[in-house]
Curated annotation (Swiss-Prot):
GO MF, one annotated term: DNA binding
Name the record gives this protein: Putative MucR family transcriptional regulatory protein RA0938
Keywords: DNA-binding, Plasmid, Transcription, Transcription regulation
Pfam families assigned to the protein according to its UniProt record, in alphabetical order: ROS_MUCR (PF05443)
Gene Ontology BP term (one): regulation of DNA-templated transcription
Source organism per UniProt: Rhizobium meliloti (strain 1021)
Domain notes: Lacks the C2H3-type zinc-finger found in all members of this family.
Lineage: Bacteria, Pseudomonadati, Pseudomonadota, Alphaproteobacteria, Hyphomicrobiales
């Protein structure tokens, strides 16, 4: 919703409009009356913090009412969600060199970061969603071995000698 500053219009100017909306709601159905009341309140709250041109007020009211109308359709049920199928067979998702993401079929050496950034999932949530065992790896075997060797070569994992 664009913010305009040429002429000032505050929430006090809405009294007339709010009363007009309330009068009209008496002849309409109860749900339309509720939407009109909510529209009046939302627009009033918006105008108490924002300044718009007077000629933009009808557009603001129309957009607000339309948004409420879209979100409160009577008796609408959400479409049935089809159970998601893995992008590759689970048995083929783990190899020595890479792990295949069951969400999108992409290959990774380490899957944890991809799951977190792209899907907002933890490894445990991923395992639960796809009904994987708790020991299902998130890192390719060869990559884990390579990292382990590198860490040992750097001296990690050994206790430090006291001086």
């Amino acid at each position: 919703m664009p913010s305009f500053r040429p002429k000032y219009l505050h929430s006090a100017s809405l009294d007339f409009i709010g009363n007009r909306l309330r009068r009209r709601s008496l002849t309409e159905t109860r749900s339309n009356g509720r939407r009109l009341e909510l529209t009046s309140r939302i627009v009033s709250a918006y105008l108490s913090r924002n300044v718009i041109a007077p000629d933009e007020l009808p557009y603001l009211i129309q957009q607000t009412y339309g948004s409420l109308n879209e979100t409160s359709g009577p008796g609408e049920t959400p479409p049935a969600v089809e159970e998601q199928r893995p992008a590759v067979p689970i048995k083929k998702s783990v190899t020595d060199d890479f792990i295949v993401c069951l969400e999108d079929g992409k290959k990774f050496k380490s899957l944890k970061r991809h799951l977190t950034t792209k899907y907002g999932m933890t490894p445990d949530q991923y395992r639960e969603k796809w009904k994987l065992p708790s020991e299902y790896p998130m890192t390719a075997r060869n990559y884990a071995l390579q990292r382990s060797k590198l860490a040992r070569a750097m001296g990690l994992g050994k206790s430090r000698a006291l001086k």
